[in-house]
Amino acid sequence: AKELGCTNTHFANPHGLQDENHYTTAHDMALIAQAAYQNETFRIIIGTKMYTIPPTNKHAEETVLRNHHDMLCTYHNANRKYLYPYCVGGKTGYTATANSTLVTYAEKDGMTLICVVMNTQSPNQFIDTVNLFDYAFDNFQVLNVAENDTDYRAETTVDNGNLNNIAPFVELDKEAVIVLPKTAEFSDTSSSVEYNDSDPEIAGSITYTYAGRNVGKADIKTTGVVVEGYAFDNESTEEEEQEAVSTVQVKPKRKW
């Protein structure tokens, strides 16, 4: 949890039952949920509505497991009142001290959101989550960085005095996105570049902010293109002799 950036979380047990040394916050739980969602098996499990375990040597009959998340299925929601069409999974929780808690994932228009609701009375955890999701989907948008950022130009320059060859040596991550209010444009963001010398496949990264808040990041990836320079003059003076030099340049047009 600490590696994910959690600052107010301490686990005293693996099951979540009440313990005075077992605590977290909505923000920390969202960070944990975000990391967990990167695991494909986890995504399958939380989105499964029902699963049947076949008979085993310990249990002669089938065991049917049902998801209790009312925004995803109808096990405790026969009238379908809380079903949410964009819900893709989540986890319910309850103790007498913590009351009802809920972590939910929803996807719409290319945007995946996580909502964490704590310390509420059922069924308010579902009502509040639906309202929060609706507000976010109605008011925010996902923008692809590579398709929208024209302020950075990545190129290689090979210069030996006779040849200036420009080729695509690095490029912005084509999958990187940022999240902005629908009233804002990509050009409204500010950005900063951090260079990387520890990963041969990542030249650096660009962090985007809007209204002082971090709204996303895009890696600057190497493409694997190799550019070689050749000197055309067999005889040259000492001042003219230059080795072919390859450089990676990320040229921002914007001012930070």
PLM features per residue range, with description:
Residues 1-10:
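Short, charged, amphipathic alpha-helices and their helix-cap/turn boundaries
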Residues 6-7, 21-23, 27-28, 33-256:
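Domain-terminus/edge residues, biased toward the C-terminal soluble/receptor-binding domains
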Residues 14-20:
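Conserved short loop/turn motifs at secondary-structure junctions
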